[in-house]
Amino acid sequence: MRIALAQILSGTEPSANLRLVADYARRAADEGAKLVVFPEATMCRFGVPLAAIAEPITGPWADGVRGIAAQAGITVAAGMFVPAADGRVTNTVIATGPGVDTHYDKIHLYDAFGFTESRIVVPGQEPVVIDLDGVGVGLTTCYDIRFPELYTELARRGAKLITVSASWGSGRGKLDQWTLLARARALDSTSFIAATDQAHPRGTLPGSAAPTGVGGSLVASPLGEVLASAGSDPELVVTDIAVDSVAAARDTIAVLRNRSEFAQIDEAESRG
């Protein structure tokens, strides 16, 4: 299966960001990719009031993504924000394309490193796996990557490829953590990991504590190998993954087969 990572740099205007989705999705499709993974906050970067730009999953921005995916003939996974009942939003990944139209709400909120996402975001409750040409694809978002039990649960539900849409916070050692965590989750779940971050804004947002990306998007194999990666600037990464190799990796490492049943996901709670 050929997949693509669209490492873009989102701005604050959803319509401009939608044009980026159209451009990168078309380019990914032209290179033969079946799936293109965009970052968290593709709709609008962090650091601005999100409730003001949030739209329903049936709204014009999401419909724009659906139209782009349909026209290009590719499945698109992209981060957006959806209004919640209490005035906050959900941090949502829309996944849409041929035979696919669903969404995932981020379960683990980024109440860490001095940022409190739960002030503005309501947590999701349910892991999501989509079917892409017979391949199970799990959907996750950014801070989720620090919680291995979600990834093993997605594998248990049939995922052989797990996407991570991120807007990673910058800081000392954070890029190394991002790369390490992606490879570790590949090993935990013995799945391919397609991890797409926002490109690094390179000092264009002085004084902002919001997580706005460090780049370093990558694809990791079920054995934790980095198969393809990006630098810090906007970039489209296209690579092939051998989905059939997942079974052999799971037989060899056997962490899913030998896993103790004490580790379960029962619920997700906001700490805000």
PLM-predicted stretches and their roles:
Residues C44, I94, Y104-Y110, L218, ...:
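Short beta->alpha transition motifs characteristic of CBS
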Residues T58-A77, I145-E235:
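CN hydrolase (nitrilase-like) catalytic-core segments centered on the catalytic cysteine
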Residues V246-G272:
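A conserved C-terminal secondary-structure "cap"
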